[in-house]
Regions:
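Generic alpha-helix structural propensity
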Residues: 38, 52-55, 73
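Acidic/polar N-terminal loop/beta-strand segments that form early-domain functional surfaces
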Residues: 32, 39-41, 74-77
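Conserved acetyl-CoA-binding loop-helix of GNAT-fold acetyltransferases
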Residues: 49-62
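N-terminal first-folded block
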Residues: 1-36
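C-terminal structural segments of small proteins and small subunits
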Residues: 62-93
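A short, internal acetyl-CoA/4′-phosphopantetheine-binding micro-motif in the GNAT/acyltransferase core
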Residues: 41-48
Length: 93
């Protein structure tokens, strides 16, 4: 199962989303000036262990870089993922 290779911002839900078939991986976020606070990353149980959340995080960090933001990982998964991916360390606030 693959994602659509990009995340979109859902204004009503205040989150970034990426569909994987009929399932959705998302991150609840808050923006403050030049920071994106990643409060919670969710992947449905059916997608856990498939790499879907990792692909989502990669796309989300590309958005952070494009929008010239800094990421503040509040969520344990987001913090762990960022620690393991040195190519995104410049984006951590």
């Amino acid at each position: 199962m693959t994602g659509n290779d990009h995340v979109t911002y859902n204004v009503a839900e205040k989150r970034y989303e990426m569909p994987f078939g009929h399932l959705m991986v998302y991150a609840n976020v808050r923006k403050d000036m030049n920071r994106l606070y990643i409060d919670y990353v969710f992947a449905p149980p059916e997608l856990r262990g498939t790499g879907a959340a990792g692909r989502f995080m990669m796309q989300l960090m590309d958005v952070v870089r494009t929008e010239k933001l800094k990421a503040v990982p509040i969520c344990g998964y987001a913090a762990s993922w960022l620690r393991q991916h040195s190519d995104y360390h410049d984006l951590i606030s």
